[in-house]
Amino acid sequence: MGGISIWQLLIIALIVVLLFGTKKLRSLGGDLGGAVKGFKNAMTSEEDKKALEDNAADKPAADAAKVTETAKVAETAPVAETAEKKAESKGKEQA
């Protein structure tokens, strides 16, 4: 009743083809397809850029965790005792 029937759509399509011609419609369709493809490429490149930024942001945190772990190991190692043992072993080698 209030909608557009299939026959009305066909008549509109026929009028558009008569007005613009098939060559112009073909080039318009190609241009529209190229624009959609460019838009999709831009969207995926933005997503890739965000993923790289997220990975770059996570990497310093991982490096900081490694440094903290190394610092904990260094704190627990008896440095003074190790230095004394090295001095004793050098004294034994010289003797």
From Swiss-Prot:
UniProt keyword annotations, A-Z: Cell inner membrane, Cell membrane, Membrane, Protein transport, Translocation, Transmembrane, Transmembrane helix, Transport
Entry annotated with the keyword Coiled coil: no
Low complexity bias locations: 62-81
InterPro entries hit by this protein: TatA/B/E, TatA/E
Region described as Disordered: spans on this chain: 50-95
Subcellular location: Cell inner membrane
Extent of Basic and acidic residues compositional bias: 50-61, 82-95
Protein's job: Part of the twin-arginine translocation (Tat) system that transports large folded proteins containing a characteristic twin-arginine motif in their signal peptide across membranes. TatA could form the protein-conducting channel of the Tat system.
Subunit organization: The Tat system comprises two distinct complexes: a TatABC complex, containing multiple copies of TatA, TatB and TatC subunits, and a separate TatA complex, containing only TatA subunits. Substrates initially bind to the TatABC complex, which probably triggers association of the separate TatA complex to form the active translocon.
Protein's UniProt name: Sec-independent protein translocase protein TatA
Native source species: Shewanella halifaxensis (strain HAW-EB4)
